[in-house]
Design a protein with these regions (language model features):
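Surface-exposed extracellular loop regions of Gram-negative outer-membrane beta-barrel proteins
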Residues: 1-21, 25, 37-51, 55-65, ...
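Solvent-exposed loop segments that connect transmembrane elements
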Residues: 3-35, 68-87, 125-139, 175-188, ...
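Short sequence motifs at beta-strands and strand-loop junctions characteristic
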Residues: 32-40, 89-92, 141-147, 190-197, ...
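Residues on the lipid-exposed face of transmembrane beta-strands in outer-membrane beta-barrel proteins
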Residues: 36, 44-48, 98-102, 151-155, ...
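Outer-membrane beta-barrel strand-turn architecture
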Residues: 40, 48-52, 92, 102-106, ...
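Membrane-embedded beta-barrel scaffold of Gram-negative outer-membrane proteins
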Residues: 49-62, 67, 87-149, 154, ...
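Gram-negative outer-membrane beta-barrel transporters
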Residues: 108-119, 137-231, 293-297
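C-terminal beta-signal and adjacent terminal beta-strands/loops
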Residues: 119, 158, 221-231, 250-298
Length: 298
C-alpha cells in the first residue's frame, strides 16, 4: 500500500493531496502510483583489423534509466520557484567512442584504449533539501557532458620473469545546464569523476631450486580529487590520494602462499564523503593491512 497517491502507511500526510502542499493546483492532482518508460535505443560499431596485431573501432550507442516515483511530490521551496514532481523522467545518454586493441613489440606489449564523449540529458539525481522536504526525492537535475581517455597495458621487458601492467583514465566532466533547484550549478563537475585515476604494478617471478615459483609484486594507485555529489548542500570535496601495496610469496601448481602489506603508508583516502542531514559522513579505504594468504588449487 506504499503508493504515491496515498503517501506511506506511517506518514500519509507527507504526500496526500490537500494536506501537505497548500498549492490548490498540486493538491488537485491525481498522483500516479507507478512510473513507466518506453522507447528505442540503438548501438552501432564499426571495426577495422589493420593487421593481426592491431584493431581499431568506433562505436555509437544510447542508453537510459527508467523513471521513478517521488514520495514527497508536491512539496515546494518557500518562494514557490520549485515543486517536487510526482514522477522523475528517464535520463538518457549518447556515447561516441573511438578505441584500439593492440599487441606490439613481438607480443611483449599489449595496449588497449579508447577516447569517448558522452552527452547526458536529464541526469537523474537524488536530492535532500530540508527547505523543500524532509525526505529524499529525485529529479532530472542537469544536462552534462563527459569527455575521457582510458587505457590499460601489459608489458614484458627484456628481463626474464618481469611483468609491468597498469591502467589509467582521464576525465573532463561538466554540468552544462541545471534543470532543477539552485542546488545544482552549471559549470561544476559531476560526482565521483576524478580528472585522473591510474594504477601501475610490477611483478617479478623466478624459479626456485625446490621447483616452486617465487614472486614479488609492488603496486601504486593514485586518484585526483573529486566531489561526492552535484547537490551543493550535500557535496564534499574528496582529496587526491595515492597509496602502495606489496606482496611476496611462493607457489606451484597446487598452492600459493604469500605475505602482503596493503596501503603501506596508511593513507586515509576518501571514497565517499557527503553532508546529507547536515552531518558529514566519510568513508575511507582500509588502513594499512598486513596478512598471510594461502590458497589451494583443486
Amino acid at each position: 500500500r506504499d503508493q504515491q497517491r496515498f503517501g506511506t502507511n506511517s506518514s500519509a500526510a507527507f504526500n496526500k493531496p490537500g494536506v501537505v502542499t497548500g498549492n490548490p493546483f498540486i493538491d488537485e492532482l491525481n498522483y500516479p502510483d507507478k512510473a513507466e518508460s518506453d522507447g528505442v535505443i540503438g548501438k552501432a560499431t564499426l571495426s577495422w583489423n589493420k593487421s593481426d596485431d592491431v584493431m581499431y573501432y568506433v562505436t555509437w550507442s544510447e542508453g537510459f534509466r527508467p523513471g521513478l516515483l517521488n514520495r514527497p511530490a508536491g512539496q515546494s521551496t518557500p518562494d514557490g520557484s520549485y515543486t517536487v514532481r510526482p514522477v522523475t523522467d528517464s535520463d538518457e545518454v549518447t556515447n561516441y567512442e573511438f578505441g584500439w586493441k593492440t599487441v606490439l613489440q613481438d607480443g611483449r606489449l599489449r595496449f588497449n584504449g579508447s577516447v569517448f564523449m558522452v552527452d547526458v540529458s536529464g541526469l537523474q539525481t537524488t536530492i535532500f533539501d530540508p527547505s523543500i522536504a524532509n525526505l529524499f526525492f529525485s529529479d532530472n537535475a542537469a544536462d552534462a557532458d563527459i569527455t575521457g581517455l582510458e587505457g590499460d597495458f601489459i608489458y614484458y621487458p627484456n628481463i626474464e620473469g618481469l611483468m609491468i601492467s597498469g591502467a589509467f583514465s582521464l576525465l573532463d566532466t561538466e554540468i552544462k545546464k541545471s534543470l532543477t533547484t539552485s542546488d545544482v550549478v552549471a559549470g561544476r563537475d559531476l560526482a565521483f569523476a576524478p580528472g585522473m585515476q591510474a594504477n601501475v604494478a610490477a611483478r617479478y617471478e623466478w624459479g626456485m631450486s625446490s621447483g616452486n615459483l617465487g614472486h614479488i609484486q609492488g603496486q601504486l594507485i593514485a586518484s585526483d580529487k573529486s566531489y561526492s555529489d552535484i547537490i551543493e548542500p550535500n557535496k564534499a570535496k574528496q582529496d587526491s590520494y595515492s597509496y602502495a601495496n606489496v606482496r611476496a610469496g611462493i607457489s606451484n601448481d597446487g598452492w600459493v602462499a604469500e605475505i602482503y602489506i596493503d596501503n603501506i603508508t596508511d593513507e586515509r583516502a576518501e571514497i565517499s564523503n557527503n553532508y546529507v542531514f547536515d552531518r558529514q559522513r566519510v568513508a575511507v579505504i582500509r588502513p594499512m593491512t598486513i596478512g598471510l594468504r594461502y590458497k589451494v588449487n583443486f
